[in-house]
Structures are given as C-alpha cells and as structure tokens.
Amino acid sequence: MENYDLYLPTHLIFGRGRIDELPSLLPAKGSRILLAMGGGSIRRIGLYDKLRELLSDYEVFDFSGIEPNPKISTIRRAVDLCKAQKIDYIVAAGGGSVIDAVKCIAAGAYYDGDPWDLVLDHSRIGRAIPFCAVLTLSATGSDYDNSGVISNSNLFPQVSILDPTYTFTVPANQTAAGSADIISHTFEQYLVKEGNPFTDAMCEGVLRTVFEYTPKAIAAPDDYEARAQLMMVSSFGCCGLLSIGR
C-alpha cells in the first residue's frame, strides 16, 4: 500500500515512517506537550523512545497508565496535570482507550469544574487542547472521529499518524478483537432501513477487507500489507464516511 494523506476533517497521515513528520505538525519549539499513553506497550515496541527523540525540542510531560475503558479518576489526574503545567498540546500514543481519554482530557483542561460534568452534558464543552493521535491498534476508529467518552466537534484530533509497523506486535487475540470492532462499527451503519448504493459498496469493501486480511495478519504479524489494510479500514468505521446518505 502506498502512503497517503487525507483530511476529513482530521489530517490523517498514513504509512511506514510517517512518524518522522511529527515535529513539523506541532506548535512552536519549546511548547509544553503532554505525552499520554497506556501501559508499557509503546515502550516495548520502541515507540516511546522514538517519540521522545522527535519531541526533544519540547518540554514533555509523561502521563501513563490510561487503562482500557478509562476511569474518570484517571481523566481527572491528567486534567490536573495539564492545568498545573499549562500544557499547549497533547500527543496521544496508543489505541482507542488512550485516544478517547485524551479527548476528555483536552476538553477538561479548559473547564473550571469536574471533567465528569462534560460526560453528562456535552454542551458544557468549550475549548479543547489540540492533540495528535499516534495509533497502535487497528480497531475503534478513535483516531478519526470526535467521539469516545464524550462527543463534540472540538474533539477531533488535529492530526493522526498511522504507521502499520507499530501494530506488528499486536497479538492474535487482540488483532481478532480489533477486527471484530471494525466489523461491528461497519454493520451499525450498513444494516439500516434505507441504504445508499455508494455507501453500501464502501461498507461491503470494508467488510471484505477485514475478512481477507485479518487471517493474514494473524498468520504473519509483520505482514505490512495486511496490517496496513486493517489500519486503513479501522479509521473509516467511525468517521462518518460510511453513513453518507443514510
């Protein structure tokens, strides 16, 4: 698969080695950046060291330990850190849980009350810290939508960097679970009372891609084409493209 860029409205930067473009996408050198992550997976695959190298001209504050289905207590701690350190930008490195958590963190940093208020009442969302998503798991489509813990047009990632090589170490069970997630998101849009020939065809293309490339990615975890195909279609599951005209 060839590298590509796509704006919808997030700037999607896809392909091997595209992570090296990160510094050109960030605010001015010296800005204060929160590096948000989950457990230890980004360290094991070398992504943490790579990001630290790319962010060497910035003041970086690590925030780790974002769990699957993030807890509001975790969000509160990150929001407090953002406020205390006057964070200018966030880099979210991980899968859907990390990226979705950062959407809430980004909004909570500009909110005077409890971030949980934003979950209960989306109309309270005002500004949000801009952020970049660096995806490590093909599943939820969080890198390309404004939803998660909360939904708001201010919560789209400005940029998402998708390098399939960072999914080579995803184990078979998580690869399969991620593919099931893509299928679920697609069927939610495909199985409606009134379809649309164009978007029906796109949904069917997503499903065919998942059915073809999931076994290949499981059989050969470092198969770049298989991982790239899954990463590509995972982004389209929640971005709204499959729902046009429905």
Model-derived regions: residue spans:
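ATP/NTP phosphate-donor binding region
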Residues: M1-Y89
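Structural motif
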Residues: H11-L12, R32-L34, F61, D88-V91, ...
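A glycine/threonine-rich phosphate-anchoring loop and its flanking beta-alpha core
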Residues: D20, Y111-P197
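Active-site nucleophile and cofactor-binding loops and adjacent substrate-binding regions
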Residues: E67, A93-G95, H122, G245-R246
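Short Gly/Thr/Asp-enriched flexible loops that form oxyanion-binding sites at enzyme active sites
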Residues: A78-V79, V98-D112, Y144-D145
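Glycine/serine-rich anion-binding loops at beta->alpha junctions
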Residues: I87-I105, T136-S142
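Active-site segments that bind and position negatively charged phosphate/pyrophosphate groups
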Residues: Q189-R246
